[in-house]
Amino acid sequence: MVRLLGYAPAIVAQPGERNVSLRRSANRAGTGILVALVVATTHPAAAQITFGSPADPPRIAIGGGAFDVLPNSGRQGNGATGLALGEYRFGDVLWIVAPFVGAFGTGKGAFYGYGGFGFDINFFERFVVTPTAAVGYFTHGTGVDLGAHTEFRTGAELDYRFENPSRLGVGFYHMSNAGIGQHNPGVELVTIVLTMPFH
C-alpha cells in the first residue's frame, strides 16, 4: 500500500507482505544450506563428507527457540512464542539412522511429545547437518490450533561438534498434521540446542 506524505511516497508493508518476506528469507536460508551441501558433496575430499556418527555416544539435548516464527494473520492464536525442549538421542542404532524421543512446551501452553529418527552428515571435520523426521502428540494451549493432535515434524539441525563430543547448533523445522485434520495450517520452529554425551 502506498501513502502520500507531502510529496514523498511512503511504502507501508501490510501483514501479508511481511509474512511473504519472512517466508522468502527462510526459503533463501534453506536454499543456502542445500547449496553448501551440494558443493561439499561434489568435493568430498575437501569437505571430508561422512555419513553417520558411530563413535558418538547417546546424548541428552536441551534448548530453546521460537514456535510459529512465520505467523499467518488469518489463524487464531497465531504469533511467535518461546519454546523450551528436551530430547534423548540414542546414537546410531541401524546403520546411520539415529532415533530420538523428546518434548517441548511453549509460552502459550502448547505441548508436543514426539519420537523420530535422523542421520548425521558430517563435513569440514567439526560440522554436522542432521535431517530429521518425527511424529507425536500435540496440544495447542492458547496458541495456534494445528488441526489435529497427531502432528508431524520435519527439518534439519546444523551443529558444531566439540571434542568431547558435545554439540551446539541451530535447527529449523516445519510442523503439520499432513492433511489428517479438517484444517492444516502448519507452523515453523527455530531452535538453539546443546547436546551432551550421556553415558
Question: Model segments located where?
Answer:
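Cleavable N-terminal export/targeting peptides
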Residues: 1-55, 199
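Repeated loop/turn-to-beta-strand initiation elements of outer-membrane beta-barrel proteins
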Residues: 60, 92-97, 125-129, 164-170
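Transmembrane beta-barrel strands of outer-membrane/channel proteins
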Residues: 62-66, 99-105, 119, 131-137, ...
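Outer-membrane beta-barrel "beta-signal"
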Residues: 82, 185-199
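Membrane-embedded beta-strands of outer-membrane beta-barrel proteins
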Residues: 84-88, 115-117, 156, 192-194
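Residue-level signature of outer-membrane beta-barrel architecture
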Residues: 88-92, 119-121, 160, 174, ...
